[in-house]
Amino acid sequence: MATNRRVSRVAELIKREVSQMLINGIKDDRVGTGMVSVTDVDVSGDLQHAKIYVSIYGTEEAKAETMAGLKSATGFVRSELGARVRLRRTPEVTFIEDRSIERGTKVLTLLNKLENARSPDDIPSADDSLDED
């Protein structure tokens, strides 16, 4: 069992290397359909499994196509990680679509709509709070 510090260092290293592979290593055209970025990597305590969370910008069809390309490139990514990262055993790689950025954007949009929908009379001013005392 690896220490927490080692697990986090390996996760950061995998994140950096997979990001580099997405830029110029994976030749599958489906991966280039949507703009892809690695948001997080979760490595198991025994360093045998790595969940790679990716954010994909584009239409739903482009996202599905990109995920299919990433799933088919899993073997290539694992072999490249084995060559680039010095570990006794290269972890099994799983790509997972990360929709947290998309959800965060929706929440911010809703909050902005609510703020714009408020009338200026609804917002108490600093003078109103002083008058009550």
UniProtKB/Swiss-Prot annotation:
BP-aspect Gene Ontology terms: maturation of SSU-rRNA
GO molecular function, one term: ribosomal small subunit binding
Gene3D superfamilies: 3.30.300.20
Gene Ontology cellular component annotations, sorted alphabetically: cytosol
Database matches in InterPro entries: KH_dom-like_a/b (IPR015946), RbfA (IPR000238), RbfA_dom_sf (IPR023799), Ribosome-bd_factorA_CS (IPR020053)
Compartment(s): Cytoplasm
Cytoplasm recorded as keyword: yes
Primary location class: cytoplasm
Role played: One of several proteins that assist in the late maturation steps of the functional core of the 30S ribosomal subunit. Associates with free 30S ribosomal subunits (but not with 30S subunits that are part of 70S ribosomes or polysomes). Required for efficient processing of 16S rRNA. May interact with the 5'-terminal helix region of 16S rRNA.
Similarity-based family: Belongs to the RbfA family.
Protein name: Ribosome-binding factor A
Organism whose genome encodes this protein: Nostoc sp. (strain PCC 7120 / SAG 25.82 / UTEX 2576)
